[in-house]
Regions:
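Short, basic, glycine/proline-bearing loop/turn elements
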Residues: 21-23, 109
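Early exported N-terminus immediately downstream of N-terminal targeting peptides
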Residues: 43-59, 65
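Short glycine-rich, polar/acidic loop-and-turn segments at beta strand-coil junctions
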Residues: 34, 52-55, 88
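Active-site-adjacent betaalpha module
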Residues: 1-7, 61-181
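Short acidic, Gly/Ser-rich segments with clustered Asp/Glu that frequently serve as metal-coordination loops
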Residues: 16-19
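A short alpha/beta connector and helix-capping loop motif
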Residues: 23-50
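N-terminal nucleotide-binding beta1-loop-alpha1 segment
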Residues: 9-14
Length: 181
């Protein structure tokens, strides 16, 4: 078990969302940035957590559904990485995430993934309540346009809204797992 003050949490980068019927904002760039974070975390011996969002057993997002499987480009290391299932927007609700982080001595959670206005937002707001300093990688989370706002507006809004009271913002290229202790 890797012990570290930092952990990387990649949220819901799964087939049915990332490769869904609606285009994501800057999906190629976001994926490259997430892969950079994963590589840097592994080099720094920082634990990497992957959340998979599932729905009811009779839904298209059941646990066994191909739609809930993580995208292969993440190169999940089954022997080292921690993959967990969640049913709610918060990665902490009814999961063992807090226990797993605490067992590894994690004090700071670095967050990336999707969707910005749902699970990324909720987890960023919940993490400090669970005692974690939180870093949101501003160019490593994404969503899609909705009826009222473009995806870029949603992302920009959340970066501004979450910064300060809930998270520290950083970019993937500027973030170093070695620099924060």
């Amino acid at each position: 078990m890797l012990l570290s003050e930092n952990a990387l949490l990649v949220i819901d980068m799964q087939q049915g969302l990332f490769r869904g019927p609606t285009s994501l904002h800057s999906s190629d760039t976001v994926l490259l940035n997430i892969r950079l974070l994963i590589e840097n975390a592994r080099q720094a011996q920082v634990p990497v957590f992957f959340a998979r969002h599932i729905g009811p057993d009779d839904s298209p997002f059941s646990k066994q559904s191909p739609l809930t499987q993580l995208i292969p480009e993440l190169n999940v290391n089954a022997e080292q990485d921690i993959v967990f299932i969640k049913k709610y927007p918060s990665c902490f609700r009814d999961t063992e995430l807090q226990l797993q982080l605490s067992q590894r001595g994690v004090k700071q959670l670095v967050i990336a993934g999707m969707k910005t206005e749902f699970c990324v937002d909720t987890t960023c707001r919940a993490a400090p309540e669970h005692g974690f300093r939180t870093v949101l990688i501003s160019d490593a989370h994404t969503t899609m346009d909705n009826k009222y706002l473009s995806a870029s507006e949603i992302i920009a809004h959340h970066n501004v809204t979450l910064a300060g009271p809930f998270v520290t913002l950083a970019t993937a290229a500027c973030w170093s797992f070695h620099s924060e202790k």
